[in-house]
């Protein structure tokens, strides 16, 4: 489409808002009028040439008592029609009744267009337009002879020929209007569509490698986050071009935003596609095509956006682990963080791949950097990457220039996924760094400040097709991105010693120690005799200080039985201390044996909980103490208790032996460490920028000094005088 003509149409439609809607609607509501009326004007322009035929055919159907209007499609030439007697042009013939006639005009549309009108919520605006008297002005503007929204050439008021507006060109107009309205309203500019050059790149990579495999027949193209349908349209256009129109392509999509869904549906109708192939609603919570599989899939799903609203449809209980908790089979592999659902869209596409055809399925999808590396081994994100890579479906990842999108300046990447790789690609993944392949824009569009030209797209496509390494193309084995996350444990080392302070701690129950200590400080030993007379004061203290205790803890705090039980435990500990003295024991294993022996000798009645309380009060971690033994196995192997505070993890690349790595990287520095093999888990991440990092050594002191003194010459020797002084 001619850029000048495109700009003229967009500017004219944009100006209608200020010319007609100012003071009638707030600026944020302009889009609610302009977008649906632009769609309707386009549909009207398409139907005008066959209007009389449709009216005649409809009259015949009425005469024959035939309610099914499907036959009208044959007369209109499109999968939609309008059986009212009005067009946009004829609505202006009766200015006094234009509002009533407009409603009749809208009612005359076929059911599929009625749904579009409904999704735009257009009828909600008609009363306001009527009261303000702007309906005629709006229709008049849209019928202006200076712009052409029809698919045919027309003459303007000067007799000049205005070029036809193709379906593709109309799509561009819609998307630019959406972008401008979003930008005007400080919304996500471009949230619902992708820059055309990025779609062009995606379609090149998607179709070029298999163009010779595409035969006569029908192929299905799918976008699970289709927005206004631009990606589907471009994909079909390029697919037809690259295959010399020898195959048919059917477009399928799903969109959650009602406005962009309406635009997409109207675009499909205009092109003769089935509007029912565009599903409305959330792809994640309500799959529009649960039983279909597709040949080609491409998408730019939302990233960094929560899927909380879809959660109930996907899982039974978010807190529970395991695939049995996941309702939707598309997502059985794993669930990403609730704050970012982009990888769920990828898994939705993966679930719809064809496995029983020669070509299989090909996917091109845009993600931000977090999809490459976010998530620990065993977590949802890592499990999704693991599933795709270990099935050998990931072909390539292409890093795009920053600020190439309208709504974000963060790094973005195209993933190419295929379940029928070429032989040369099997077991390998290609990374292409296209971050520097762009040309600056003269004026920013939202956050978009650059664009890819055809030369850049051709360069990337050639790199992909050649499958060779270069400065901006790297090829790695699948295993290169995987690692084993091992848990490194170190032994618990404890020392024990009876001290007056440690024994005194036992006076108070650990779970309510602070509250018991306050009560004892204020009421002393009387608490052991008659605590009831202090209950009111204790409760007043709790209320005043807003202390919230569990009912069971509050009961213990006010219980004489509990106070005396703690006193008995403290007194028992004192008897043990009298027996063992104040010696420090640095071998916990021997100490516990001695402690139990002493308790037995003193005939003390201490339960398991009480014994633990005593040990906890007199024991602390000491790196110089002996290791605490957990158990000794039959063969004599000693298993030590692990110190959770010293627990660490290491990521061992899959191509390295875990034990060799452990000896080299861990035992050399921490001789008493060991691996808890029960916790070893495999993960995958793609640290894209690391693979293309070029180390630049710092300049030498001599070089820097020479440069400084070279600059010093320009300052009349001042620096030299300072240095010499």
Positions of PLM-derived features:
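Conserved Class I SAM-dependent methyltransferase catalytic core
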Residues: 29-42, 332-417, 708
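Conserved S-adenosyl-L-methionine
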Residues: 188-299, 303-320, 343, 368-370, ...
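Short, contiguous acidic/charged loop-to-helix segments that flank catalytic cores in large enzymes
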Residues: 312-317, 323, 328-340, 370-380, ...
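Flexible, glycine-/basic-rich loop-and-beta segments that form/coincide
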Residues: 406-507
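Extended hydrophobic-aromatic, low-complexity segments
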Residues: 307-310, 357-362, 373-376, 397-398, ...
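Non-catalytic, mostly N-terminal accessory regions of nucleic-acid modification and defense proteins
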Residues: 1-210, 277-288, 399-402, 426-433, ...
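Short acidic (Asp/Glu) and glycine-rich catalytic loops that position anionic groups and cofactors
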Residues: 182, 244, 274-278, 323-329, ...
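Feature representing long, continuous alpha-helical segments
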Residues: 233, 262, 299-301, 343-347, ...
């Amino acid at each position: 489409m001619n850029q000048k003509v495109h700009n003229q149409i967009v500017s004219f439609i944009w100006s209608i808002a200020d010319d007609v809607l100012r003071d009638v609607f707030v600026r944020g509501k302009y889009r609610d009028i302009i977008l649906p009326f632009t769609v309707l004007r386009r549909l009207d322009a398409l139907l005008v040439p066959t209007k009389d035929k449709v009216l005649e055919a409809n009259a015949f159907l009425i005469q024959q008592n035939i309610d099914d209007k499907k036959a009208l499609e044959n007369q209109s030439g499109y999968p939609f029609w309008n059986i009212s007697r009005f067009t946009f042009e004829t609505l202006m013939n009766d200015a006094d009744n234009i509002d009533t006639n407009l409603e009749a005009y809208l009612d005359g549309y076929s059911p599929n267009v009625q749904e579009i009108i409904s999704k735009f919520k257009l009828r909600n605006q008609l009363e306001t337009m009527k009261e303000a008297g702007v309906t005629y002005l709006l229709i008049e503007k849209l019928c202006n002879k200076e712009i052409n929204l029809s698919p045919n050439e027309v003459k303007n008021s000067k007799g000049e020929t205005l070029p036809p507006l193709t379906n593709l060109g109309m799509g561009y107009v819609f998307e630019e209007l959406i972008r401008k309205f979003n930008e005007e309203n400080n919304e996500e500019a471009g949230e619902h569509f992708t820059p055309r050059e990025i779609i062009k790149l995606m379609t090149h990579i998607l179709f070029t490698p298999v163009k010779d495999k595409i035969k006569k027949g029908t192929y299905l193209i799918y976008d699970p986050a289709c927005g206004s349908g631009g990606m589907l349209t471009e994909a079909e256009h390029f697919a037809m071009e690259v295959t010399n129109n020898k195959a048919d392509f059917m477009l399928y999509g799903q969109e959650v935003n009602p406005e962009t869904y309406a635009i997409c549906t109207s675009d499909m109708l205009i092109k003769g596609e089935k509007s029912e192939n565009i599903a409305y609603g959330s792809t994640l919570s309500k799959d529009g095509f649960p039983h279909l599989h597709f040949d080609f899939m491409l998408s730019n799903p939302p990233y960094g956006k929560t899927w909380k609203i879809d959660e109930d449809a996907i899982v039974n209980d978010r807190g529970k682990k395991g695939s049995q908790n996941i309702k939707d089979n598309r997502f059985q592999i794993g669930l990403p963080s609730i704050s970012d659902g982009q990888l769920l869209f990828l898994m939705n596409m993966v679930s719809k791949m064809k496995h029983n055809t020669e070509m299989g399925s090909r996917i091109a999808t845009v993600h931000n950097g977090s999809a490459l590396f976010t998530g620990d081994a065993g977590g949802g994100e890592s499990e999704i990457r693991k599933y795709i890579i270990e099935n050998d479906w990931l072909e390539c990842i292409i890093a795009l220039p920053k600020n190439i999108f309208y709504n974000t300046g963060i790094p973005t990447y195209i993933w190419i996924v295929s379940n029928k790789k070429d032989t040369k690609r099997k077991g390998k993944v290609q990374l292409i760094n296209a971050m520097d392949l762009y040309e600056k824009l003269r004026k920013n569009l939202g956050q978009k400040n650059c664009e890819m030209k055809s030369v850049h797209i051709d360069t990337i496509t050639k790199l992909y097709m050649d499958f060779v390494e270069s400065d901006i193309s790297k090829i790695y084995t699948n295993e290169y991105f995987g690692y084993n996350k091992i848990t490194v444990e170190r032994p618990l080392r404890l020392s024990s010693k009876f001290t007056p302070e440690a024994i005194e701690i036992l006076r108070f129950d650990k779970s309510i120690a602070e509250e018991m200590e306050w009560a004892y400080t204020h009421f002393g030993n009387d608490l052991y005799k008659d605590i009831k007379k202090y209950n009111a004061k204790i409760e007043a203290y709790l209320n005043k200080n807003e202390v919230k205790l569990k009912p069971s803890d509050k009961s213990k705090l006010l219980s004489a039985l509990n106070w005396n039980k703690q006193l008995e435990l403290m007194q028992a500990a004192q008897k043990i201390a009298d027996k063992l003295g104040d010696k420090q024991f640095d071998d916990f294993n021997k100490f516990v044996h001695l402690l139990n022996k002493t308790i037995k000798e003193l005939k003390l009645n201490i339960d398991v909980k009480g014994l633990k309380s005593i040990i906890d009060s007199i024991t602390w971690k000491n790196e110089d103490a002996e290791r605490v033994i957990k158990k000794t196995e039959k063969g004599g192997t000693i298993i030590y208790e692990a110190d959770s505070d010293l627990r660490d993890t290491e990521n061992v690349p899959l191509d390295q032996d875990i034990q060799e790595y452990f000896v080299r990287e861990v035992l050399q520095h921490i001789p008493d460490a060991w691996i808890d093999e029960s916790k070893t888990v495999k993960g995958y991440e793609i640290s894209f920028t690391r693979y293309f990092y070029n180390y630049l050594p710092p300049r030498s002191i001599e070089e820097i000094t020479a440069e400084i003194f070279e600059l010093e010459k320009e300052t009349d020797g001042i620096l030299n005088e300072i240095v010499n002084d």
